[in-house]
């Protein structure tokens, strides 16, 4: 909701402590951090660790290789897509693709749409979407739902609960942080 503060659980505090983000106890079981500090210091830490952050792009497709394993993504500039210009996209190869696209699980849905017979590691083999909001339960199952759901494709964050039909989470971000950590470990 673009608020100036975000809430995390104590379990995720160590991730912020590691990169110097200040957290203040709000009430038992919850900490509050400055949203701008969290985003800017997290981005800087990721860049310092070797990540590349591309802004203003859309994922149009996935790259596949033997056995229809996901081996990268096909991207284009968001402005190109919005203007409906005919500009060739660019393929980016990757050992593993992490779908952290949120509630829509866009990469997973693209795999299901474009690869005949593809099935996700989910209750029905598809992307059923999240159940209605139950923030505490959604946070509780999020790390468990963070996993490889198709060869070469890992889900994290809200996309993980969308694929696993977990409850929608509320405006608490600790589970999202721990889900991202888990995805990186996979």
Give the role of each language-model region.
Residues 1-186:
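Residues forming the flavin
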